[in-house]
Structure formats: C-alpha cells, structure tokens
Design a protein with these regions (language model features):
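Extreme N-terminal starter segment of soluble prokaryotic enzymes
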Residues: 1-6
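Phosphate-binding site of ATP-dependent enzymes
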Residues: 162, 170-306, 333
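Short, solvent-exposed loop/turn segments at secondary-structure junctions
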Residues: 12-13, 47, 75-76, 105, ...
Length: 371
C-alpha cells in the first residue's frame, strides 16, 4: 500500500477560497499528512477532460501514485461530467478505492434515488420519477407511454389527489424545485385526472416566489428539466410540516457528525430550506436528535442494498421532513440524499474536527478495501 490519496477538484467555481481550493480540502489533506499519509490535489477542467492525452496523463499518474481518490467536484462545475466519471470508473477498475465510486455518486445523488427507496419506511409509496424515453433507455429504466415514468400522463393524476413537489435532478439552491397546488383547494379528490386548463399556483424553492399558471402550460415549461443526460423530475407529496423545518444529517461514512435544522422563512408560501431564500439554520449535536439518528442508522443496510450495493459515500447528507402517521405520531420522511460534493465549512468551529474525522475514515476505508 502506498499510503497516498488524491483529491480531485474542478478549477474555478463559487465554492473555492482565495487559494483556488475548496475551503474544506486542505484541512483534509493536512489531516492525512498528520497521520503519515501523502495527500495531493489534482485539478480537472473541461479542456483537460476533452483532451484525451491530458485525461490519460492524470489517469496514469493517479494509478501509479495513489491508493484511492476523494472526489470534490461540485455538480455543474464540469460540463464534461460524463468524461470525469469515465476517468473515475477507470481508476476504480485499476484498483484505486473510489470515494465515492462514480456509480455510487449517481445512485445516491440522483433525485430518483427516492423512488428506489419508496417501498421502505423512508419514502412515501406515491413518489414517482419522470424521464424522456431516450434517457430512460440510457439508464436502464423501462419507459412506456402512459406508464409511471410518463410525466404528462401522471402528473395530472397525482396533483388531482393533493399538493405535490416537483424536483429537477440538476441545479442547486432550490432552482427547479416547485411546490404545486390547485388554486381551488376544494377541488382535490373530485376527479382522477385534472384537465390541462386547471388553474394552479407554483412556488419555486429558489426564492419562494409564486406564479399563477395553467397545468398544461406549466408541464410544457417543466419539460426542460427532462432534457439531456441525467434529466429527470421527481414527483412527491408536499409535506406541510416543512414549515417546522428540514432536518439534515451530515454523515461521515457510517457516522453522523452533526444535524442542521433548516427552518423556512416565515409567512406566505415559503417552503424553501435554502439560506438564499431566508431560511434560518441551527447546528445541533446528533444526540439532540437521538431517535431520528437511531432510526436512520438502522435503515443504512437497506439504503445501501437498494441504491446499488456500493459502499456508503465518504461525506454525505440525508434530509428529512416531519410528517404525521395514521396514529397521530411524528414520523420522518426522506426528502433527499446528497453525496457528490458535500461541504463542511459551516459552522467554522466544526471544520478542523471534521477534517480529522475524515482523515481517520479515509484510512479506515482504504485499509479495509486493500486487505
């Protein structure tokens, strides 16, 4: 074993500090060095990825020098993400330990992960994922006209029953996440299929602004979210208790590190838990949410098996919203998993401690894989 790890980053982007690195990268590098390991950062750009010889140069260097890689590339920072994933996949095939494996990034990080978990305690059974036929074929999903993955056939049915949330797969900070409800709240449950001229109110999580639209026109607008590789929409029940806050668990591999309580702005149609939209964040110890933590950790084996049986990501988050069960008791619903490039720069006092824990986890993962 070489006792050597490479961190992959993308040049540029709003997630970088003045030194050009992500703010949480060098603390992890230094934590590994303090344990007697070598750690280096290699940058990717779209130009490098498009250039086969440059791409291969990084591959050969990484294969020769390192036991594993840690991917610190934010979704959207590289247009050539597919080529980047190809490099990572090739490195995993060559024996490097992927943190995470690119297919695990897709499995855990794509919004349709929720539909793979809908027959568990975590996700409501009426959660659906919509694709264009070509994208469904590319990712191995069976698409049929009028079937469960057909957006325009299904959304008028799900919305007829109650308020929904539509989430695009790409984007961040709430862009392309819409709360959709009928203008006439008394009309739910009256028909199985809403007509296309049904008047609806759409609120975007980006900034909580609302728009009055017609159902057919809004669905036409949403087709942009289905275009291209990884294009999809996830359709979920709207949970009104989001007003009480979203609960995010930051995980290091199998260990919860802290919990963020994200309370949406007060008033109006606000439902977004993003800072940009005015949500307030509070950072808690895992023990402050012990019942949620214990329940979630008990679900990890099933989550792992249903999302492709890849190892858990190195750094990842799970977001929960409160709901009420049929007996009137609290229950938690999984709203999203993030794993592509989760940061831990806030709160600042946690960063060094978490970086040391990440270093310990990297060593444990690599040593376990190399045995």
């Amino acid at each position: 074993m070489k006792k050597s790890i490479v961190f992959f980053e993308a040049k540029g982007g709003s997630d970088k500090g003045p030194d050009g690195y992500r703010k949480d990268t060098m603390p992890m590098v230094n934590a590994l060095k303090a344990k007697g390991w070598n750690a280096e950062v290699i940058f990717f750009t779209d130009d490098i990825l498009r250039n086969e010889s440059e791409r291969n140069k990084i591959y050969e260097e990484a294969k020769a020098k390192f036991d594993g890689y840690v991917s610190r590339v934010n979704p959207g920072n590289l247009k050539e993400e597919k080529l980047y994933f190809d490099v990572l996949r090739k490195l995993c095939d060559a024996g490097l330990v992927g943190m995470p494996h690119p297919d695990a990034m897709i499995g855990y990080g794509a919004k349709d992960a929720l539909t793979k978990l809908r027959n568990t305690e975590l996700v409501p059974t009426d959660t659906l994922a919509y694709y264009e036929p070509n994208e469904a074929a590319r990712i191995g999903v069976k698409w049929e006209a009028g079937g469960e993955h057909d957006f325009k056939k299904n959304f008028p049915k799900t919305l007829a029953k109650g308020e929904r949330v539509l989430k695009q797969n790409r984007g961040s900070t709430g862009e392309g996440i819409w709360r959709v409800r009928l203008e006439d709240a008394s009309a739910y449950g009256k028909v199985d299929l809403l007509p296309l001229d049904t008047k609806i109110i759409c609120t975007e999580a980006k900034d909580n602004h609302s728009e009055n639209r017609q159902l057919g026109e809004f669905m036409d607008f949403c087709e942009v979210y289905l275009k291209g590789d990884n294009g999809m929409l996830v359709d979920m029940t709207f949970l009104p208790r989001i007003k009480e806050g979203e609960i995010r668990i930051l995980m290091l591999y199998k260990t919860p590190v802290y919990v963020v309580h994200k309370k949406p702005a007060e008033g109006g149609d606000a439902f977004s838990a993003t800072l940009f939209s005015g949500a307030k964040y509070r950072y808690d110890e895992p023990k402050d949410w012990q019942s949620l933590i214990d329940w979630f950790l008990a679900q990890l084996p099933e989550i792992r098996s249903k999302l492709g049986n890849y190892d858990l990501p190195l750094i990842w988050t799970a977001d929960f919203i409160l709901d009420t069960d049929k007996n009137g008791a609290d229950k938690y619903v999984l709203g999203e998993i993030n794993c592509s490039c989760v940061g831990f720069t806030s709160p600042a006092e946690f960063m060094e401690k978490i970086a040391l824990m990440v270093g310990d986890n990297i060593v444990e993962i690599v040593e376990g894989a190399k045995k």
